[in-house]
Amino acid sequence: MSRDDVSIAVVGGGIGGLAAAVSMLRAGVDVHVFEQAPALVEVGAGIQISPNASRLLHRWGLRAALDRTGVRPVAVHQRRWDDGRTLQRAPLGEAAEAAFGAPYYHFHRGDLLEALADALPPERLHLGHRLAGFTDHGDRVELRFANGATVSADVLVGADGIHSTVRGELFGPEKPRFTGCIAYRGLVPADRLGHLELEVLANNWMGPGGHFVHYFVAGGRLVNFVAINERETWTRESWTDRGEVADALAAFKGWHPQVGAIIGAVDETFIWALFDRAPLDHWSVGRVTLLGDACHAMLPFMAQGAAQSIENGATLTACLVRRGGADVASALRRYEALRLPRATRLQEMSRANKTRFHLPDGPAQQERDALLATRGDRSIAALGWLYSHDASVIDGNHAHP
């Protein structure tokens, strides 16, 4: 059975959809990506890619592209909100690569998206294709697009985000859950912050009702920040709503001066309400399955949303190569069985970190800080189950290149 005997239509040209397509093409699978936007334009924000995802991207031939724009932090610092005290320093950099076999990166999201898109032949990526509906005929899936185009494929992969049309068609309408958090995000030219003498770190400042993350991206030219603050209610879901710098500064009044200095140096900030969805019991129906935020939208508090989407693509490719076009439904069930428990675990851990990061000063916070201090170097080693994972391995063997 050849690898090109099954045709795949991926709906959604974000990081997860493009990564899946790159993985499939490397394995000789016939795949096309359909993206509703007329151009691939990623929001101005940072993204963390841990070794469990970077090993896959390297294997797919992207290492040189990633090294051009990616920043490799030497450590992650957990810090106290008011006095800046480092509660824990966990090594990354060379130590993480030696331990897990692949590096930990920080990227501008646009740089990562561009690297993935450049790895696809232009004829495999179809822009301006908004999915209007689909029909699973049993032996194939027919896709209908708002521009009037129709496409037939053996498998439909819905990688179309938290507002997934494919998920809605499979399982009915469902509103995402507001998590009680909003985030101000921004990118600051690094030369504006030279007086702070920032190290090349992943920084997480934890305080009452919020936390503040910052790190270098774009080859060190920019500092990305995300300032998370708790709110009781919110209705809009958007990555692109403009925020007020003054509001972000007010939300973090009383925090360490470095926090205010980073926020205050930004030209513009965007406000992002954090929504997620309850974990699904299954992702696949017939010849249709889901990938990424479409099936496991999670808070960014484990820095695993994109990484898990990339893992999805590797595992789905491996399952399709193993089973081939003759047994698509079985391949999708295998993919789901391998991926759903891990993604659900990380959804739940990400939600738990909201409470852990936002503790008010008091006994629970003191217990958390004491525990962080005792772990040190061991905190990263404890994540071996996460960072050492190779999502392309099925039954102990690599199922594709």
PLM regions: where:
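C-terminal helical "tail/cap" subdomain of flavin- and related membrane-associated enzymes
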Residues: 1-6, 68, 261, 302-303, ...
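Conserved N-terminal helical subregion
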Residues: 2-8, 50-189, 232-246, 372, ...
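Conserved mid-domain beta->alpha element of the FAD-binding
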Residues: 9-38, 157-158, 184, 214, ...
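Conserved N-terminal glycine-rich FAD pyrophosphate-binding loop of Rossmann-like flavoproteins
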Residues: 39-55
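Short helix-loop capping/hinge motifs at secondary-structure junctions, enriched
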Residues: 64, 190-197, 323
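Active-site substrate-recognition segment that forms the wall
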Residues: 79, 200-235, 245, 249-253, ...
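A short coil-to-beta-strand element that immediately follows conserved catalytic motifs
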Residues: 178-180, 197-201, 245, 257-273
